[in-house]
């Protein structure tokens, strides 16, 4: 992992623990969305009958095969009576609100409110009936008329355990089902100028005619939408026509304050910028060589041929000047001494010379007028070319002084080097980027650190890498693999030729030891050994003859260099994955308190001396050396609801934190049947039993219905037998439970502290093979057994078995703007990419969606593998041909919408989509592709079903930092010295015209807090700044795994966790089970004749093993 740390934290989140998902069945649905009055949240005790599961397609909201009857959902103290069982008279099938309206033949004996009627053409009825979760319900229980929005007002009070314990057989509300979209060969729609009209609709869904779908997509923009008064805008045909929403005014809610930001005002120059094309022959790939050529050219010809201009060069094909050069095109010849040959130029060592031909040709004028217009808010598009020129100008001088990496610069002189272990060291540096903001041009400067390879003799590097004396015993095969992997591509210089320090790039290791290597030295076929050649030619006696040689050059002309004559060249960034110890060491180096970081940033700006930078002077760029002072507001925390049976029924968090003391989970899940497996040889059976008992008690105290004893005694097993142990224990438990109609609800697993691949293997087997949620606990926690740890684990277990820990009081009292007024679904989506160096691993996309309304607390998730480093989520919407059903539609959005409908009894009338992991350069592409997929998924469920969409990108990998205006004012900082949670900024350092804001929603723990940046790319719900900022901040207090507000909105966080988890599902080619066929290639529900691997970019992506149905319905990723 090429880990760059800017705020003392790595960019990924480690997933600590796991838990078995609660199955639906006798005694435990564990799911409690839409509680009955008086029901504190323990789900029904029996499973309702369901029709066969529908995988993938289906006709609209209604599954392909109808279910049986209208089940009941029995909570504690009330019940929901399903309507439309055997006697229900809906000839069209499904609830009346989903019937097509207006065409001949669409008669609705069941009635239904007109605003829920679909508007299909003739005969748009849905045969086949539907399971009870599709039927409208009579909500019986305590209290009054049905609340607005068509959803029962959940009741979170009442004595725990009052009534409802003995439930009639078969009376259960089904847990919402999720079907993983089958993996099929699907040609994703191209992101090209095709409107979301006839041209962009892929194949029509089977449930309506081809003509209807064509018409429906053509008219998306113009038709009124039945569930909202706002017209739906057509999906933009291309980036040329896209306009991101303008800022709807600035927010006013919250306590006003001033913060400082690491942005420095840059005065816009009034120079006349010119761009020239550069062609250098022979062509070289190294920017460093190109720059050396240009530096030499400017040194020689600046005053004689360039009119005294000092150009800025991007290292490739473009040169920029402040004013014109005295020619339109000119050719120069430049001679460079080859730095690969010699550095010292000592006696008798003549360096080779290389001749380069450079052609400089006028290309265009870079107009700064448009940039000024954009900054003033009078032009919509940012003139990227002008911004790029200014960026290149300000990077010119640091590039000559430091080692550039992306937009950052590093040097061993910018701070003390720190050893990271195994031949690596950290270098300090800074990030620099020019940005357009409301205050004008801004230079964003931040501190950064990254890993470099220590400039050691190769022998010493290898000894550090293997952590042993390599002269004692020969290298093993695994040692050789490790060395080869670490050194491939690394540049070394030879040390056995005095001042002649020629440089080479390592391509591999020899398979033989140095003493066994020989090669021809002349045309007559004379052969010499490497040892003999070095002794005779250089007088150098090789000592480590048992080690392999480094191989440099290519396979046709291999060149052998003994390790002991090579030294690693300084300044090479390590771009591969760091191990845990190295990450910890790098974190330690980079973790800075806010005050220290602020001082370092100011020192860096002062040290860079932009006022003396000859390139900045040439182009007329002036940089203010003071941090920007920015108006901010601190949003208040939301009040959180807990169960009425606890001593504290709600809580108002203080500085982003609260605790579970005297509180009970608002909906405690039920775990009647659980087991424990111990993979740690340090934990005795008695210790495992004691730990599990304490954990069970904590779960009970926290509000869960948790059996104190496991169904079987804890089993101790060896990590290498993980699959055998899991399956055997699961089978033993089910042999006991199945005859009684019960299921295993949870598996508690004790792991060694360093468990390698065990955690991932265990999760894969549990979640994709056994259908079991699991909770992993490390050995060190078993021995410590702290109350705080047990309480945190209980929070995770509860949501894994379908419970809720807390909900927003405002959600229950229907006071969340644009969420509480009508059924709203909130999505989170993320794509995680493989680590650098893993060239063929797929990227993993994850989408989660809220499954409860009005609470918006529970999120079901789906995951999918896609092409390597593909950022667009490919499986949001899919169309394929089925030999029996014709054109079938599916995909992650459709599955989650159906699941929401099943869980709440209502279709979403609003969509809020938080998308993580998108860089600014991908905004247009991601919006065009993914908004189109959302639209198509909705239209495939029901003709003209187009709920308004708000699409928000969440960014954490930016370099804006906010600091308190006065670090000594305790009222404006938290305990770590960071700004207060809830601090929001939407002025000065934000976009000149678009709808974006920075929100620091969490309290700092260590280091400097990084605010999340939210940028709205599409908004049909017409949020005000206050509404979206408050919603986002409040949601950050609903994260299930801790009693703290978190730094990014939970749906995006959950999507990240789900994607991270799914990487464990990719088995190696062989495992202890011998093959991968168990779930990947035989993806369940795949239509006959459809291949399981989707082809993306000519590379078949192996699909992930399918999640089991009962796992995907709960928050298994927590």
Curated annotation (Swiss-Prot):
List the biased-composition ranges (Basic residues): 10-24
Under the heading CDD domains, the entry gives:
PAZ_argonaute_like, Piwi_ago-like
Q: Which SMART domains match?
A: DUF1785, PAZ, Piwi
Q: Does the keyword Ligase apply?
A: no
Domain PAZ: start-end pairs: 457-570
- The annotated regions of Low complexity compositional bias extend over 25-35, 148-157, 193-219
Which GO molecular function entries does the Swiss-Prot or TrEMBL record give?
A: RNA binding; RNA endonuclease activity
Cross-referenced Gene3D superfamilies: 3.40.50.2300, paz domain, Ribonuclease H-like superfamily/Ribonuclease H
Pfam families in UniProt: ArgoL1, ArgoL2, ArgoMid, ArgoN, Gly-rich_Ago1, PAZ, Piwi
Q: Does the keyword Transferase apply?
A: no
Source species, domain of life: Eukaryota
Question: Under which name does UniProt file this protein?
Answer: Protein argonaute 1B
| Organismal lineage | Eukaryota, Viridiplantae, Streptophyta, Embryophyta, Tracheophyta
Q: Which gene encodes it?
A: AGO1B
């Amino acid at each position: 992992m090429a880990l760059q740390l800017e705020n003392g934290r790595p960019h990924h989140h480690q997933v600590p623990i796991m838990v078995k998902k609660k199955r639906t069945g006798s005694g435990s649905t564990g799911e409690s969305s839409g509680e009955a009055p008086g029901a504190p949240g323990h789900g029904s005790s029996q499973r309702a009958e369901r029709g066969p599961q529908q995988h993938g397609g289906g006709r609209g909201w209604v599954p392909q095969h109808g279910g049986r009857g209208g089940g009941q959902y029995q909570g504690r103290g009330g019940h929901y009576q399903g309507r439309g069982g055997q006697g229900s008279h809906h000839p069209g099938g499904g609830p009346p609100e989903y019937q097509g309206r207006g065409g001949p033949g669409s008669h609705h004996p069941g009635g239904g409110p007109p605003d829920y009627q679909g508007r299909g053409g003739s005969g748009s009825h849905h045969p086949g009936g539907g399971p009870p979760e599709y039927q409208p319900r009579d909500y019986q229980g305590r209290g009054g008329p049905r609340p607005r929005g068509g959803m029962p007002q959940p009741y979170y009070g009442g004595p725990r355990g009052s009534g409802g314990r003995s439930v009639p057989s078969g009376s259960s509300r089904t847990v919402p089902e999720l079907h993983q979209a089958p993996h099929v060969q699907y040609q994703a729609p191209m992101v090209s100028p095709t409107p979301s009209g006839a041209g962009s609709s892929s194949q029509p869904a089977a449930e309506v005619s081809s003509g209807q779908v064509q018409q429906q997509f053509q008219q998306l923009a113009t038709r009124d939408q039945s569930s909202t008064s706002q017209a739906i805008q057509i999906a933009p045909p291309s980036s040329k026509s896209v306009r991101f929403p303008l800022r709807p005014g600035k927010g006013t809610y919250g306590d006003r304050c001033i913060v400082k930001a690491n942005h420095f005002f840059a005065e816009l120059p009034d120079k006349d910028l010119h761009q020239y094309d550069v062609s250098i022959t022979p062509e070289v790939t190294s920017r460093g060589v190109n720059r050396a050529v240009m530096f030499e050219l400017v040194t020689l010809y600046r005053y004689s041929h360039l009119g005294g201009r000092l150009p800025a060069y991007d290292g490739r094909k473009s040169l920029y000047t402040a004013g014109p050069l005295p020619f339109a095109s000119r050719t120069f010849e430049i001679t460079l001494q080859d730095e690969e040959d010699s550095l010292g130029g000592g006696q008798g060592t003549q360096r080779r010379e290389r001749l380069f031909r450079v052609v400089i040709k006028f290309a265009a004028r870079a107009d700064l007028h448009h940039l000024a217009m954009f900054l003033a808010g009078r032009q919509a598009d940012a003139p990227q070319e002008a911004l790029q020129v200014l960026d290149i100008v300000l990077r010119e001088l640091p590039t000559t002084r430091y080692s550039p990496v992306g937009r950052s610069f590093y040097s061993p002189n910018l701070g003390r080097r720190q050893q990271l272990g195994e031949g690596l060291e950290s270098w300090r540096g800074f990030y620099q980027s020019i940005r357009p903001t409301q205050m004008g041009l801004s230079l964003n400067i931040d501190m950064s650190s990254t890993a470099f390879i220590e400039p050691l003799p190769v022998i010493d590097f290898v000894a550090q890498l293997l952590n042993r004396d390599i002269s004692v015993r020969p290298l093993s095969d695994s040692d050789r693999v490790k060395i080869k992997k670490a050194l491939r591509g690394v540049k070394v210089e030879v040390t056995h030729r005095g001042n002649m320090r020629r440089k080479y790039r390592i391509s591999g290791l020899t398979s033989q030891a140095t003493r066994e290597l020989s090669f021809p030295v002349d045309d007559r076929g004379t052969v010499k050994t490497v040892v003999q050649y070095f002794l005779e030619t250089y007088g150098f006696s090789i000592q480590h003859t048992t080690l392999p040689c480094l191989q440099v050059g290519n396979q046709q002309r291999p060149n052998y260099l003994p390790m002991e004559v090579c030294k690693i060249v300084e300044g090479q960034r390590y771009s591969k994955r760091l191990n845990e110890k190295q990450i910890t060491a790098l974190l330690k180096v980079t973790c800075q308190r806010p005050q220290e970081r602020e001082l370092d940033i100011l020192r860096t700006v002062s040290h860079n001396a932009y006022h003396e930078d000859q390139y900045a002077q040439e182009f007329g760029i002036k940089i203010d050396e003071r941090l920007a002072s920015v108006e901010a507001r601190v949003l208040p925390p939301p009040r959180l609801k807990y169960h009425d049976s606890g001593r504290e029924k709600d809580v108002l968090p203080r500085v982003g934190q609260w605790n579970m003391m005297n509180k009970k989970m608002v909906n405690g899940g039920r775990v009647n049947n659980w087991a424990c497996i111990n993979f740690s040889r340090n934990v005795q059976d008695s210790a495992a039993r004691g730990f599990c008992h304490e954990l069970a008690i904590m779960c009970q105290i926290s509000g869960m219905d948790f059996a104190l004893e496991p169904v079987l005694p804890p089993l101790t097993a060896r990590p290498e037998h993980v699959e055998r142990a899991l399956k055997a224990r699961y089978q033993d438990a089910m042999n006991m439970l199945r005859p009684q109609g019960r299921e295993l609800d949870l598996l508690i697993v004790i792991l060694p502290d360093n468990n390698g691949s065990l955690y991932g293997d265990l999760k894969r087997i549990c979640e994709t093979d056994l259908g079991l949620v699991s909770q992993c606990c490390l050995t060190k926690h078993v021995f410590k057994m702290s109350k705080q740890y047990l309480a945190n684990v209980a929070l995770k277990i509860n949501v894994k078995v379908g419970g809720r820990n807390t909900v927003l009081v405002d959600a229950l009292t229907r006071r969340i703007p644009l969420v509480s007024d009508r059924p709203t679904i909130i999505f989170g989506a993320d794509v995680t990419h493989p680590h650098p160096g893993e060239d063929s691993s797929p990227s993993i996309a994850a989408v989660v969606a809220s499954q409860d309304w009005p609470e918006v607390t529970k999120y079901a998730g789906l995951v999918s593998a896609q092409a390597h480093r593909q950022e667009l989520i490919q499986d949001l919407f899919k169309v394929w041909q089925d030999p029996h059903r014709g054109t079938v539609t599916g995909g992650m959005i459709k599955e989650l919408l159906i699941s929401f409908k099943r869980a709440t009894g209502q279709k979403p009338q609003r969509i809020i989509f938080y998308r993580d992991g998108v860089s600014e350069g991908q905004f247009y592409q991601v919006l065009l592709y993914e908004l189109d997929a959302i639209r198509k998924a909705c239209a495939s469920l029901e003709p003209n079903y187009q709920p308004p969409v708000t699409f928000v990108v969440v960014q954490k990998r930016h370099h804006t930092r906010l600091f308190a205006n006065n670090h000594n004012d305790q009222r404006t900082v938290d305990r770590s010295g960071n700004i207060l949670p809830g601090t929001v900024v939407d002025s000065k350092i934000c976009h000149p015209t678009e709808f974006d804001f920075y929100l620091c929603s969490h309290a700092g723990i260590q280091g400097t807090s990084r605010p999340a940046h939210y940028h709205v790319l599409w908004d049909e719900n017409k949020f005000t700044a206050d509404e979206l900022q408050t919603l986002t901040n409040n949601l950050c207090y609903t994260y299930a795994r801790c009693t703290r507000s978190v730094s990014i909105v939970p749906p995006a966080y959950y999507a990240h966790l789900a994607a991270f988890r799914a990487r464990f599902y990719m088995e190696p080619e062989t495992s202890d089970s011998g093959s991968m066929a168990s779930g990947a290639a035989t993806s369940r529900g795949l239509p006959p004749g459809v291949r399981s691997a989707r082809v993306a970019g000519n590379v078949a992506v192996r699909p992930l093993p399918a999640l089991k149905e009962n796992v995907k319905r709960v928050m298994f990723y927590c």
